[in-house]
A protein has these predicted regions:
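Hydrophobic alpha-helical membrane-association signature
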Residues: 2-4, 41, 107, 155
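A generic structural motif
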Residues: 14-19, 120-122
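Glycine-rich phosphate/pyrophosphate-binding loop and the adjoining helix
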Residues: 121-170
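Structural signal for well-ordered, non-membrane alpha-helices
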Residues: 8, 53, 156-160
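N-terminal beta1-alpha1 ligand-phosphate binding loop
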Residues: 1-16
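N-terminal beta-loop-helix "entrance" segment that forms/cooperates
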Residues: 23-40, 135-140
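Helix-loop-strand module that forms the ligand-binding subsite of alpha/beta enzymes
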Residues: 40-118
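Hydrophobic/aromatic beta-strand patches that form the interior of the parallel beta-sheet core
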Residues: 21, 94-96, 123, 127-129
Length: 170
């Protein structure tokens, strides 16, 4: 999803250190709460999220929700339970959802519920994009629609602002 690439690029331009996990990196085994030892790909995901002060999660609508691969990856974040900040505790999470029709709102709602369950803070702005709006983002993360670019700017400001504020509380 090029929307995630665009958001990651904008975060980097705002001064954030970024790591992007795409579809290939989410090819994980099914989540099991009783894994004796996490597979290497899961350890990498969990380790990067453990270091993160904020996240962006992007998803297409899959029949009123998100993809199984994304939900599975988010489930593995429970394995941060032993960390100083378990799950997504107090981390701002920007959300992006793209859909052919009105389903982007459903995907966004599903993402918000999952992020809340993990203790994260979904940003006030969650972006829903139609296929036409997604097409305004090229493979390099450039956004040709001023309206879409403005929304992304607000989302990035919210993630950076919440992460900054939290870092000054601890």
């Amino acid at each position: 999803m090029w929307a995630l690439g665009a958001a990651t690029r904008m975060l980097a331009q705002a001064g954030a250190e970024t790591v992007m996990f795409g579809v290939a990196e989410l090819d994980l085994p099914p989540y099991e709460p009783d894994f004796q030892e996490l597979p290497p790909a899961v350890r990498r995901l969990v380790g990067e999220v453990r270091r993160a002060d904020g996240l962006i999660v992007a998803a297409p609508d899959y029949l009123g929700g998100t993809s199984g691969a994304l939900k599975n990856a988010l489930d593995f974040l429970w394995d941060l339970g032993e960390a100083a900040r378990p799950g997504l505790d107090a981390r701002p999470v920007g959300l992006l959802a793209c859909a052919e029709g009105p389903g982007a709102g459903d995907a966004l709602s599903a993402l918000r519920a999952t992020v809340h369950a993990l203790g994260g803070w979904p940003t006030p702005l969650g972006i829903t994009l139609s296929r036409q709006e997604c097409a305004a983002i090229d493979q390099y993360g450039a956004i040709s629609s001023p309206g879409v670019a403005d929304q992304f700017g607000v989302l990035i400001d919210q993630i950076m602002g919440f992460a900054y504020a939290w870092s000054h509380l601890i």
